[in-house]
Curated annotation (Swiss-Prot):
Lineage per the UniProt record: Eukaryota, Metazoa, Chordata, Craniata, Vertebrata
Top-rank taxon: Eukaryota
Organism this protein belongs to: Rattus norvegicus
A GO MF label: phosphatidylinositol binding
Gene coding for it: Pxdc1
Pfam families, sorted: PX
Coiled coil location: none
Protein name (record): PX domain-containing protein 1
All residue ranges annotated as the PX domain in the record: 1-134
Length: 231
């Protein structure tokens, strides 16, 4: 199972002010062509900087587990927090729009927790840019502006492993990314609930790939990407 897991953080003395879930990207995560869904998350930090992140359902489960492990004396208090319920709501969502909204609610819950937790190394590390985010980011984007465009299917773009000329964005998949390929991450039995199981993506695997990329366009401010093959 691929993920955006990494250790350590360079975001000391900073915290997340807000986050929005823009959509879902389905990426190839192994040489066998296995695909996994990643939520595309826009985060705004205390210094007004903006990061675009990609996290899987398994990453969300690990975040909640690591919070409990990092504060063993507060396990009972963290158990009362609506984190587990949020994960179950995401896993049980029957459509993509509901799933995106539930992911956003869970992340808002995390960053709204007392500073002891929301500004802990565990949370800051989760929201730090990962090697996967480095590959998918667009360095030419400097500002956010409203963008109302139709959903874009990108599964075929990912399979092409190269440049996209569909006038939406340029994507390059680098198979040398650490923690990718066929490497499996260690997880104990309690974490299996949060793994991205087959039933989690069954509605996307049936039929003709209804939407490999779906965005929440009702009120989000998205980044319009421009494609330039010469970049």
């Amino acid at each position: 199972m691929a993920s955006a897991v990494f250790e350590g953080t360079s975001l000391v003395n900073m915290f997340v002010r807000g986050c929005w879930v823009n959509g879902i990207r389905r990426l190839i995560v192994s040489r066998r062509g296995d695909e996994e869904e990643f939520f595309e998350i826009r985060t705004e930090w205390s210094d007004r900087s903006v990061l675009y992140l990609h996290r899987s359902f398994a990453d969300l489960g690990r975040l909640c587990k690591r919070l409990r492990d990092a504060f063993p004396e507060d396990r009972s208090e963290l158990a009362r927090a609506p984190l587990r319920q949020g994960l179950l709501a995401i896993k049980g969502a029957h459509d993509i729009e509901t799933r995106l909204n539930e992911v956003e609610k869970l992340l808002e819950t995390v960053i709204s927790m007392p500073c002891k937790y929301s500004r802990s190394e565990v949370v800051l590390t989760f929201f730090e840019r990962s090697p996967l985010d480095q590959v998918l980011k667009n360095d030419n984007v400097h500002k956010i502006q409203p963008s109302f465009q139709s959903p874009v299917k990108i599964s075929e773009i990912m399979r092409s492993n190269g440049f996209c000329l569909a006038n939406t964005e340029t994507i390059v998949i680098d198979h040398s990314i650490p923690n990718g390929k066929d490497q499996l991450l260690d997880a104990d039995s309690t974490e299996h609930l949060f793994e991205n199981g087959g039933e989690f993506t069954s509605e996307l695997e049936d039929g003709d790939d209804p939407a490999a990329y779906v965005t929440n366009l009702s009120y989000y401010h998205l980044v319009p990407f421009e494609t330039d093959i010469l970049d």
